[in-house]
């Protein structure tokens, strides 16, 4: 019973719950960005490059033989995933910049009175 109680306390701590929410939101955000790239950016980029569809770009290493499918290097999908990554990284970078601007700067730690007094005494003794 002690193990279950410890696990519940661990799982209900703010950091774990915050991380879980972040992972879920990040997953949903990744799907949105993937859709943005594959459904909006890639077709426009295809039109600009003369009707090329990146999803179909591949090198055929071995032709299909009977029931065995062709062996291919799908570099078009790789390009699409790189674009996904760049957009996600940029969005996260912008969010972090906004969060850092919104956060209040940490107040400078002031020295305790005794430490300040000793520093002043030291400085006075130095000057004599």
From Swiss-Prot:
Top-level taxon: Bacteria
Keyword annotations of the record: Cell inner membrane, Cell membrane, Ion channel, Ion transport, Membrane, Transmembrane, Transmembrane helix, Transport
Chain ranges on the Periplasmic side, renumbered to this chain: 46-74
Transmembrane segments: 17-45, 75-94
Molecular functions per Gene Ontology: mechanosensitive monoatomic ion channel activity
Pfam families: MscL (PF01741)
GO cellular component: membrane; plasma membrane
InterPro entries (UniProt xref): Mechanosensitive_channel_CS, MS_channel, MSC/AndL, MscL_channel
GO BP: any one term: monoatomic ion transport
Assembly mode: Homopentamer.
Role, per record: Channel that opens in response to stretch forces in the membrane lipid bilayer. Forms a nonselective ion channel with a conductance of about 4 nanosiemens. May participate in the regulation of osmotic pressure changes within the cell.
Name recorded for this polypeptide: Large-conductance mechanosensitive channel
Gene behind this protein: mscL
